[in-house]
């Protein structure tokens, strides 16, 4: 029902935050509540889960985290609380990478995840998390000068989408200075 909520974080608890949206305080369960600052504005990507016991809002820092939560929920044996506990115990990049690589033993270290559930997670989600793995490995493969060049392109006004489109081409070039990469990038961007 809700995509996101914008408001002021009024309370931070180990399991949840309270977000004041125009005078209404929403209790939102989060995998990483201490990522927010109290009495500061925040945008929380939320998922509303309706159960017999009540309605609960789960909140995430990014849309990608919310999507990963929904994918975890699609696995038989994983409920919302287990999905949040898994996401709280590990960063999403490492989690997605472990699932992609079929690391059942790695997944069993999460609370409430035994060997059977870990195998089910791998079975259901392997091959469906490519976007998360690409994002996590892509930055690690770039040289510092290329990373600087990509930041410079964004500072020059190019969108992240445009920069992401040419990044693989730049990464294949021989190592260069940041200025050299920017020149190559501008040539690629102007070709379109």
Curated annotation (Swiss-Prot):
Ranges for region Domain II: 62-137
Predominant cellular place of this UniProt entry's protein: cytoplasm
Ranges for region Flexible linker: 137-140
Ranges for region Domain I: 1-61
UniProt keyword annotations, A-Z: Cytoplasm, DNA damage, DNA recombination, DNA repair, DNA-binding
GO molecular function, one term: four-way junction helicase activity
Domain III: annotated segments: 141-192
GO cellular component: cytoplasm; Holliday junction helicase complex; Holliday junction resolvase complex
One Pfam family in the UniProt entry: RuvA_C
GO BP: DNA recombination; DNA repair
Family indicated by similarity: Belongs to the RuvA family.
Subunit structure: Homotetramer. Forms an RuvA(8)-RuvB(12)-Holliday junction (HJ) complex. HJ DNA is sandwiched between 2 RuvA tetramers; dsDNA enters through RuvA and exits via RuvB. An RuvB hexamer assembles on each DNA strand where it exits the tetramer. Each RuvB hexamer is contacted by two RuvA subunits (via domain III) on 2 adjacent RuvB subunits; this complex drives branch migration. In the full resolvosome a probable DNA-RuvA(4)-RuvB(12)-RuvC(2) complex forms which resolves the HJ.
Function: The RuvA-RuvB-RuvC complex processes Holliday junction (HJ) DNA during genetic recombination and DNA repair, while the RuvA-RuvB complex plays an important role in the rescue of blocked DNA replication forks via replication fork reversal (RFR). RuvA specifically binds to HJ cruciform DNA, conferring on it an open structure. The RuvB hexamer acts as an ATP-dependent pump, pulling dsDNA into and through the RuvAB complex. HJ branch migration allows RuvC to scan DNA until it finds its consensus sequence, where it cleaves and resolves the cruciform DNA.
Annotated domain remarks: Has three domains with a flexible linker between the domains II and III and assumes an 'L' shape. Domain III is highly mobile and contacts RuvB.
Protein name as it appears in the record: Holliday junction branch migration complex subunit RuvA
